[in-house]
């Protein structure tokens, strides 16, 4: 079937309203060959989950296996920067398949188990209190700048033993790294600048941690221990430290910001949350899961076909690029009743905001904890959160669903 949807995923309409764009694809051509960018676009829930469960067919080693030019095209003069970026991303543990991925993930996997994460809940609450106390002084805040960003940034920096005065630097570098999912022709410039500055910043810290006995309370120390066991090289330790710093706060930023916006647009759901009228699991747990489903922090993930494989009646050739869209799968009517409705009573909530299979998000428990505490605090403090704009501008990324600002008044 030939779809009637335009193939440019980077248009303003597709960025601002991915649910209409990819929803139409899902309805018309759920495994769609995008002719413009020469890749498969997968939009259905069951197809996405099937792919994650068949990792032997669809490789995570995208940067290693894919030798073609980037999409959209970049400035020809920046191809050297593109190769530098590719080689760097190859060192991330999420860019490996089994057994390498399993061995490398094991280095820090235990650190993120639910019991370990619970130990951080008091600190999360303390940071939230500080943020909201400051907002109370004026009765206004930019949710993105004043709440959603400082909370998870503080937490991951503390977990990794980063000096508090370096948080601003970490965030500025993370913002440059996020150009990876954007379409500007000159995007390699800020992206590679951030990689180089991050490497320069983290290398001496990793050297310091590696020279000492492992400190189980320090995530960077635990990560550095992977070099001693042979699971990681020094370059991989540094690269994974950058990954953890980035992924350790960006997903939660978008969860909190997108979720807050959803509640302002659905006052009846805000009332249910405040009144706690839901049975087990409680309203906060249900609300956080529905925020993750309704407007997920990550829109899409890319893979490359390891072998010829059939999906949705289409033949995917070895080496083909594939991009699956979480944002569409989470609104699939074949999986969710009334999928375009924000309903915090929805349970069970079988969204795929954190992926599925062996590459399920390592930090999912942490993101959930931070989201739960953020929404709980907002509901306990405020009767009304009113958005002070009618225009919502999103970062032009097909990877992340990220608002630029969210100004609100608080009463």
Question: Residues of each region from the PLM?
Answer:
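Cytochrome P450
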Residues: 1-411
